[in-house]
Amino acid sequence: MLRRTVLGALASLAALAADSSFSAAARARTPAPANAEAYIIWPPDGAVISGGKLWVRMGLRNMGICPKGVDLPNVGHHHLIVDADLPPLDQEIPSDRNHLHYGAGETDARLELPPGKHTLQLLMGDYNHVPHDPPVYSKKITITVK
């Protein structure tokens, strides 16, 4: 009977550990200074870009930049959100074509976008790619590629 209870408890714990929503909720978020601010230096909001290739310059005030995996106070790394809304702010930031990770501590990036309107927004992530508490993100800007 005791063996069955222990095995049942272990199976329940394994299921909870595999559940990403439980894992994300169980992690404490990394604190950020209340006055931290992420911003896009270039391109400016409303810019018209010819050819689709552009550099994005990323800025940050009142925090430092460091590579992923470095767990120090008041630091993080940039994530650029392209043509999407902010992801859930209490979970790891996705890594896909709309959520670009700059885990080496980059502060500028080369993008190639198809013609049309596009939105860009920065979101800072901690050593585990989870937004800080409070989250540090830029204003969403819109650019047009000709």
Kindly label every feature range from the protein language model.
Residues 87-89, 125-133:
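Short acidic/polar inter-strand loop motif in beta-rich domains
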Residues 27-51:
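Short, compositionally biased P/S/T/A/G/V-rich stretches that sit at domain boundaries
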Residues 70-78, 137:
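Short coil-to-beta strand junction motifs in C2/discoidin
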Residues 3-7:
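N-terminal export leaders
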Residues 59-70:
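Short amphipathic, basic-aromatic surface patches that mediate peripheral association
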Residues 52, 76, 114-116:
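A glycine-anchored, Pro-Gly-centered beta-turn/N-cap motif
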Residues 134-146:
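Short beta-strand elements
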